[in-house]
Amino acid sequence: ARIRAISAGQQSELEARAGEEGWDVTRTELEVLRAARPTAPAVHGSSPVPTVRVLEAAAWMSAGIDEPDCLSEFGERTLEAAHPLRQIGLRELVAECARIEGHSVPRVFGDGQATIRAGFSTISLPGILESVMNRTMLAAYQASPIAALQLCAVGSVSDFKEVSRYRLLGTGGFEKVSPTGELKSGALSEQKYSNRADTYGQILMLDRRDIINDDLDAFLDITRQMGRSGAESIDDLFFTLFLSNPGSFFSAGNSNYLEGADTAFGTDSLTSAKTLFRKQKAGPGTKAKDQKPINVRPRFLVVPVEVETDAELLMGSAQLMIDASGTKTKIPVDNPHRNKYEVVSMPHLSDSYYAGSSAKAWYLFADPAVLPAFEIVFLNGRRAPVIERIEAPPNTLGMGFRGYIDVGVKEQDPRGAVRVKGEA
């Protein structure tokens, strides 16, 4: 009764709990006093300063990098923390980096001088920008088709010195082992192929105008173009060398060249080119074993864009019909070339920018993993370009980055490709 009197008029919940839990008078009085205390107002502090990792994730999201890539790189927890900043611009990114490292920056951007100077003096800002730039450049590079990587062997070099590749003669083939178990020695020819990597790249500056304009995507468009340029530079190197016909690479002497009025692209000329390709010898020596066939098949049919449709029709047609006069028609009886070769068509082959270009010449290439006609090498096997920060000139209020790729292209085994002139 006394407990009921103490809690009466206040909280029926307390009375019920007191009965259920067997509170004494003292406990009941204490709980009533606690319940009667006024509730303190909630205190709302300022939002916590994001970490460098959260800012980096926010910058990735703002740059439009695919969500699965972001999740793989940062994890779900970091992405959740970065979500409120997913549309962060350059101004806010610069300011937040400065605050993280203890710099006092104005809340109002104004002319940006104080914020920009503080941000550019940090360690975190260039690191975040370098990360975002490398990712956007890599995505652009990987989205760009590179014909050279289909047609060439790909190797790795550890420095910029010239490296050598040797060709195994026909005398190096397997021979029957005598009853004594003695294996005969093969021989490497004196003929060797070389290659080396060089550096290709450009400089990119982030200056105060980019920060004031507050357009991260516009800045990253330049980075994306650097990625595309990296891909284009590989094809440019390859086609410049390839079309120049270095050292008479494609020639009758190498048994990999056809010309004449009957070599215009078509069924019969493709048959002739395939036959020439299939009859390549182990050579180049004069011994009987050097004249053994190597039995390598062409895999790629390489044509200029002017011939691309005809090549695709020939590869895709189940039948070929010839009229009474022997003239080929557009109507596709059995096609021996159907789906035999993978068509690779590039505008470089007929563009007058490249010496040796032709709108009529076409080629057959072996699988480069079997018999490479050309080789591409990358320094330490890194195929994609890379972006690094560099020191900006002292008279420049900005931040410098360099994008570059270390790559080399060189002709290798002439037996790995055939050129057909396509005309007399």
Would you name each region that the model predicts?
Residues 110-200:
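Assembly/oligomerization interface modules of large self-assembling protein complexes
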Residues 202, 206-221, 225-285, 338-340, ...:
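Alpha-helical scaffold segments that mediate packing/assembly in large oligomeric complexes
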Residues 289, 293-298:
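Short gly/pro-enriched beta-turn/loop segments at secondary-structure junctions
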Residues 260-268, 272-283, 299-300, 306-424:
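Sequence/fold signature of self-assembling virion shell proteins
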Residues 24, 121, 192-196, 215-218, ...:
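Secondary-structure capping and boundary motifs in well-ordered enzyme cores
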Residues 197-201, 296, 396:
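Short, solvent-exposed loop/turn segments at the edges of secondary structure
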Residues 1-123, 417-424:
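Intrinsically disordered, low-complexity terminal tails
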Residues 119-142, 222, 313, 361, ...:
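Short, Φ-rich (hydrophobic/aromatic) sequence segments
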